[in-house]
């Protein structure tokens, strides 16, 4: 999948829920991706920041939002993998 496809998956993950934690995580991941694309953060900084989002998501995971958070974590992992290839 491309960066744009993973970003679209993030968009879908927070549009499909009213949970503010999910919405904030997805928006933050998208902002970090834009920072990487514009060269404002290094690949290593980006990967660390994205992994931090996953750690926070795992802490915040609730039964009601498990599927949404898992979908978001999959998209974030895809973005991390793409960044690692650059």
Q: What are these model-predicted stretches?
A:
Residues 1-86:
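Cationic, hydrophobic amphipathic alpha-helical membrane-interacting segments
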